[in-house]
């Protein structure tokens, strides 16, 4: 889930999704899947049976582009909770302008990034709902309610967010309901000092919700928080985009397959890959 002081990451603005992702009859399952066929080796999330009591851990965001910092957070959460992490690309979050790459491109880059990564799954709930409900604004609480309807009331569900997003959590749509409907796993950066930046209203609402261990989140459907304190990397999507646009050194910020994709597509004003010399 991306940083920001308003509802972030999981939602879409006015259901907006580029036409390239709607090419086959407006059907998300048909239009996205063929385009992902070249990204072999990635795993796609399927909604588990309601009988399953395993914690469902959702990491939403624009992933524009997905970078090594995103992957470090996802891996750390996977290892801390010993469950898969479902990475959910958003179509167009309500709090920010349209992303630099369209939904299909970001979905393809995410699939490339997690190819061969055990326990990291692609989840297309947001993209599919944006196509099914064009023109309808969607927020994180909408996604959680949709997932809750599919999973059932008793399955533990958690959202993985950054500490900077938590600081503005009380500006999210129906944030108090969201606190009860799902757990929050907060990825912290060393020395960020986010605890001191929490608004008083939010700090009061979070008091008493912090879990003693990550395992505690599996014992309740929602309502708890856990701080994922790891030596996380400092990459950001805005840093990657700025370096690409400025002709700086950027390739080390993203997985190699994603760097190749960005070059080939000319995303973020990247220079296309040079053609191979004639033999």
Regions found by a protein language model. Name each.
Residues 8, 45-48, 52:
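Intrinsic disorder
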Residues 2-4, 14, 21-25, 29-35, ...:
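Nucleotidyltransferase catalytic core that binds NTPs
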């Amino acid at each position: 889930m991306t940083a920001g002081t308003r509802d972030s990451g999981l939602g879409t603005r006015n259901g907006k999704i580029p036409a390239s992702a709607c090419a086959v009859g407006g059907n998300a399952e048909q239009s996205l899947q063929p385009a992902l066929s070249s990204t072999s080796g990635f795993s796609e999330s399927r909604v588990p049976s309601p009988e399953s009591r395993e914690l469902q851990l959702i990491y939403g965001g624009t992933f524009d582009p997905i970078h090594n910092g995103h992957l470090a957070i996802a891996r750390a959460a996977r290892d801390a909770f010993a469950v898969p992490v479902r990475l959910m690309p958003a179509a167009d979050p309500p709090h920010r302008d349209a992303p630099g790459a369209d939904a299909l491109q970001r979905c393809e880059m995410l699939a490339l990034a997690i190819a061969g990564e055990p326990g990291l799954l692609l989840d297309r709930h947001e993209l599919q709902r944006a196509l099914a409900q064009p023109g309808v604004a969607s927020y994180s609480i909408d996604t959680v309610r949709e997932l809750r309807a599919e999973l059932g009331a008793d399955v533990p569900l958690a959202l993985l967010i950054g500490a900077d997003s938590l600081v503005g959590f009380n500006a999210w749509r129906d944030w108090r309901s969201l606190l009860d409907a799902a757990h929050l796993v907060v990825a912290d950066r060393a020395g960020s000092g986010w605890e001191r930046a929490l608004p008083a209203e939010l700090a009061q609402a979070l008091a008493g919700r912090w879990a003693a261990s990550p395992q505690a989140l599996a014992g309740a459907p929602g309502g708890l928080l856990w701080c994922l304190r790891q030596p996380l990397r400092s990459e950001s999507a805005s840093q990657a985009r700025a370096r690409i646009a400025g002709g700086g050194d950027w390739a080390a910020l993203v997985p190699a397959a994603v760097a190749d994709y960005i070059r080939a597509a000319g995303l973020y004003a990247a220079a296309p890959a040079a053609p191979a010399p004639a033999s």
